[in-house]
Amino acid sequence: MGPTNILAAFIAVSSLFIQSLALNPYAKSNLAVYWGQGAGQNRLSYFCEKTSFDIIVVGFINVFPDQGPAGWPGSNFGNQCADSYYYTKNGTKTKLLDGCYQIKEDLPKCKALGKTILLSLGGGAVHDFYEVKSEESALNFADFLWGAFGPLTPDWTGPRPFGEASVDGFDFDIEKGSNFGYSIMVRRLRELFLQDPLNRYYISAAPQCIMPDKYLSHAISNSAFDFIFIQFYNNPSCSAKRWVTNPKSVTYTVDDWVKYIRKSGNPLAKLFIGLPASKSAAAKEDYLTPGEATKIVSTYMAKYPSTFGGMMVWEATASENNKLGGLPYADIMKEVLLRCDPDPPTSTVTSTTSASTSTQTSSQSTTMETKTLSASTTPSSPSTVSPSSTMQTTSTGSTSIETVTTRSQEPPSTTISTRSASTEPVTTRSQEPPSTTISTRSASTETVTTRSQEPPSTTISTWSASTETSTSSQDSPSTTISTKSAPTGTVTTRSQDLPSTTISTRSPETETETATTKSQGSPSITLSTRSSSAETVSTRSQHSSSTTISTKSAPTETGTTSEHSTSMPVSTRSASTETVITRSQNSDSQSMTVSTRSPSTESITTRSQGSPSETFSTKSVPVDTISTELPSQTPTTIITGTPSDPVSAPTTTVPPNPTLTLAPSSSTTEDRTTITTIITTSYVTVCPTGFTTVTITYTTTYCPETASLTPTQPPIPGAPAPPPDGWTTIVTVCPQCAPTPTTVTLTVPTRSAFLPARTETRPVVTVVPVPENPIKNVKPSESGDFVTVTTAAPATVTKTLEYNNPVDSDVNVQPTGGSSPVEFEGSAMTVRSMDVVAKALITAGAAVLGLFLGL
C-alpha cells in the first residue's frame, strides 16, 4: 500500500471515529435549534460550541427548482453569506448563494464537536412561495440536494455551496404551496443515503400543530421521518402555552400527535415539542417560562418514553438574546430535559488500533497496558489487587482485548478477560488470592489454566455463540450449572466434595478450549466455557459455599429454576457480548451478580420456591425482528436479526419487569466498583453493491453503587420494541439486494454513544475570506424511473448525553451580507435583500470586492 493509500485509509478511519461522537438519535432529551435567520446572528461555530445543542437546523432553501431561475433552487442564510450567486453554463443567474464562506469553515468544526447539522427546506417568510409540481421535479430536487450538500463525490459536477463540508440530513419546514412531492423526495433521499453507508443521515419534518398539517401530513403518513419538530405555537387551538394553562381548551394535543406518528410511515419517529425561544420569536402569548416548559416535558416524557424525543426551539439568536439567570433560553430548556429524563445513561466508544497487551501483577498492584484509540467519558486508571497475590499473564498475537476489573473489600477480586484470534496459551498462577478469575476465548485452539490455594468463592463463566443455559439446585446451598448449544459435542463432569474439578469442552468446528482449576482445602469450583459453535458442558457439585454465575452469549436464551435453594441466578438473552461482574465480601457470604446490557438483549427472570433469598438482575430492552415485503409477482422479504429458540425449563415464572434483589451478606463497607464492558460484534448493513458485514468494537461503563436499575417500560400494544443502548434501526431501500428495489430494516450502531464533556478552552478564529470565482455549473441531470416501496418501522434506543455548562466563544462575527427579520408565518424566516448600507459598502470597496469575486 502506497503512502497515498495509507493516508486515505487513515483519513477514512479518522472520519468514522469523529462521526462516532455525534447524536444519539433516540434519546428522550435531545434539543434541536433552528439557526440562519436571526437578526445580527452569530456564526454557526459559535452555537456549535454550546453543549446544550444536539441538532442545529440551518435555514433555509427557500426557493424550489420549479420556481427558481434555470430550474435551480435558491437559498437564504441571513447574514452568513455574501451577495454572490451561482450561474448556469449559459450565464443564467440563479438564487443559490455561493459566498457562504463562514458556513464552509464552521461546518467541519461543528462535526468535530459532535453536532448534527440539518439543512431545512421551505420556511415561513410571508413573501416566499415554493412548491413541487411533479414527481420528476421531486426526484431531481432530491438528487440536487444530495449532490450539492451531501458528501463530496467525484461524480457530482454541480455546485457545492458549503465546499467539501456536508450536512447530516434534511429538514422539511413546508408552509407554502401544496403537499405534493415531499414523500417522493424523502424516499429518494433514503435511497441516496445508501451511497454513504459509513455515516448516518436524518430526515425531519416541522409541521404546524394543527392536525392534519396542510403541507406535511401526506409525507409523514407515507414516508419515513426520523424526527417530527411540531410547532406548538402561532396556533391558539393547539399551542403549548394554552395546554399548560388549561389542557381541556386545546383541540390538538401531544397525545393526538403521538397517536398519529405511531400510525405514520415511521411509527418510531421521535416527537419534539417546538417552542419559541422568546416572546418576540413568535406570538408572544405562546412563550413558555421554564416552569411551564417543565410541566409539559415531564408529563409527556413520562407518558410516551418511546416516542418523546426532546424539544425544538425557534430560534438560536432569539434564545441567545433571552437570557434567564445568565443562561440563554435554549440552555435552560436542555436543563429541563435532562432533569425530566428518569435515567440518563452514560457510555464509552472505543476503537482499537493495536492488539498488543502486557499484564503484570506484583504483590501490591496490577498494571495493564493496551494501545488503543479511544473516546471515553470515564478516565482510565490502573486496577489494584490485594497483597499476597502474584499473577503473571502473557498474551501474543491477539486481535482484541477485553479487561474488566472489580474491587471489593474482604476479599477483593480481579477478573481478566482476553480474546485472541490465534492459538495461544494463557497461564495464571495465584497463591492464596481471595478470588481470581481468568477467561480467554480464541477462534482456534487455546488453553486456560488456573491454580489457586484456599480460594473462598466460586465463579462460573460461560460464553457461547448460540446456547441455552439452565441452572437448578435442590435442597442444597450448592448450584448445578448446565450449558447446552445447538450442535453436538458434550462433556459432563460431576463432583461431590472434591477439592478440585477439571472441565474440558470441545466443539465440532475444530475449536478446543480447556479450563483447569486446582485448589487445596477449598470447596470452590471454577468453570470457563466459550465457543463460537457447539458446546455442551454440564457440571454438578454439592456442598459448595458460594456460587456466582456469569453468562456471555450471542443469540442466547437462559432459563433458571430453583427449588429450596439459597440464591437465584440471572437469565439473559443477547445478540452480542454481555459482561457480568461478581463481587463477594468473604468466603462465607452469599454472592451478588450484576450483568450489563448488550445489543439486542432480552431478559427472562425466574423465581425459586422456598428460598430465603433471590439474586437476579438484568437490564435490557426487548427486541422485535422487523421484516418488510415488496409486493410483486415474487415477493421479496428481507429479515434482519436472528431470533433464538424458546427457553426450555420445567417451571418458569416471568415477572412483568426485571427487578434486583441483593442476597444477604455480612456488613462490610465496599469500595466503589465500576464495570467496563468492551464489546466486539458484527452487524449487517447495505453498501452500493448489496449487503455487507461490518465488525465494530465499543465500550460501556456502569457503576452499580450509584446507578439504579429502572424497570423496562412494558411494550406498547402494536408498537415494535426499540433496540438497546448504542444501537438503532434504520429503514432504507436497497436496489441491489433483490431483483427489484427492496425496503430493508437494519439494526446498526448509532454514530456515537455520547459526546464527551468538552473543556472550557475556546478557540479564537480569525476568518480570512479566500478569493473565489463564481462557480458556473449546469443543472444536475434528471433521474430515471422510481419505484415506490413501503418502509418498515425502525426500532428505537434511548440514551442521554451528560449536560455540560455552555461556554462562551471568542469567535468574532464577520458578516458578509445583511438582512433582518420581516413578517413571518409559523417558523419565521427572513427575506434576503440588498439594503442601502450593503450597497454603499460594496460601492466603496469596489476594488476589494473585485479581487474577492475574481472580477
UniProtKB/Swiss-Prot annotation:
Residues 346-400, 457-483, 522-533, 556-567, 642-652, 659-672 have a biased composition (Low complexity). GO terms for molecular function: chitin binding; endochitinase activity. Residues 401-456, 484-521, 534-555, 568-641 have a biased composition (Polar residues). Residues 29-340 form the GH18 domain. It is found in: Cell membrane. Its EC number is 3.2.1.14. It holds the Pfam family Glyco_hydro_18. Residues 1-22 form the signal peptide. Its main location: membrane. It catalyses: Random endo-hydrolysis of N-acetyl-beta-D-glucosaminide (1->4)-beta-linkages in chitin and chitodextrins. Keywords: Carbohydrate metabolism, Cell membrane, Chitin degradation, Chitin-binding, Glycoprotein, Glycosidase, GPI-anchor, Hydrolase, Lipoprotein, Membrane, Polysaccharide degradation, Signal. It comes from the Eukaryota. Glycans are attached at residue 90. Residues 827-855 form a propeptide. InterPro entries: Cts1-like, Glyco_hydro18_cat, Glyco_hydro_18_chit_AS, Glycoside_hydrolase_SF, Glycosyl_Hydrlase18_Chitinase. It is a lipid-anchor; GPI-anchor. It is an enzyme of class 3 (hydrolase). The active site is at 175 (proton donor). A lipid is attached at residue 826 (GPI-anchor amidated glycine). GO terms for cellular component: extracellular region; plasma membrane; side of membrane. GO terms for biological process: chitin catabolic process; polysaccharide catabolic process. Residues 341-672 are annotated as: Disordered. PANTHER family: ENDOCHITINASE, ENDOCHITINASE A. Belongs to the glycosyl hydrolase 18 family. Chitinase class III subfamily. May be associated with endosporulation. This is Endochitinase 2.
